């Protein structure tokens, strides 16, 4: 379904102006513990396409066990990257519908500019 979405957006000429993000909130432990592999927030992946993202580009890697990233991108950095791509001011305080304040990506977050052409 993901590939079909990307292909459809590309064929319609909409991919360059649409950022598609496929992300999870955690990875899986490198070791099997008998019941599965459990949640593992230290090393996981996300996929970005369109919206100026370089095609076929891979950013970062992990050690051979898949336990630790060599160039970690925090969840806040990912949020800042998405916000930057969408043209949002990263320093501005926004408020949710219930009044909760938040900053896109957080105060120390940095967009990963290397992802973009």
Report residues per predicted region.
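Ligand-binding pockets and gating/stacking loops
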Residues: 1-117
